[in-house]
């Protein structure tokens, strides 16, 4: 039985998500789920979250991002799915 291929979740998080510990919180949740990737502040106020791992764990992270228990205030999350394109080690704040 072969392992499921890894997927890549790219989530654009809109709202009051900078300067409130959002990237740190996201990193902690991603590491708990065994995901790799990063969370980065963008000049327009969004946070870009890139996570790679199993589809199930990436979906769990997306649910947490949309769930309302994050630091700050999330107004919406736009998610894009693709195959894991590169090898990423760890989960980092950028």
Swiss-Prot record:
Matches recorded under Pfam families: Acylphosphatase
PROSITE patterns tied to this protein: ACYLPHOSPHATASE_1, ACYLPHOSPHATASE_2, ACYLPHOSPHATASE_3
InterPro entries: Acylphosphatase, Acylphosphatase-like_dom, Acylphosphatase-like_dom_sf, Acylphosphatase_CS
Broad class of enzyme this protein falls into: hydrolase
Active site location: 23, 41
Entry annotated with the keyword Zinc: no
Record's keyword terms, sorted: Hydrolase
Domain Acylphosphatase-like: start-end pairs: 8-94
GO MF terms, alphabetically ordered: acylphosphatase activity
Catalysed transformations (reactions): an acyl phosphate + H2O = a carboxylate + phosphate + H(+)
EC number assigned by the record: 3.6.1.7
Record flagged with keyword Hydrolase: yes
Record PANTHER family: ACYLPHOSPHATASE
Family according to the record: Belongs to the acylphosphatase family.
Annotated protein name in UniProt: Acylphosphatase
Species in which this protein is naturally found: Mycobacterium sp. (strain JLS)
Taxonomy of the source species: Bacteria, Bacillati, Actinomycetota, Actinomycetes, Mycobacteriales
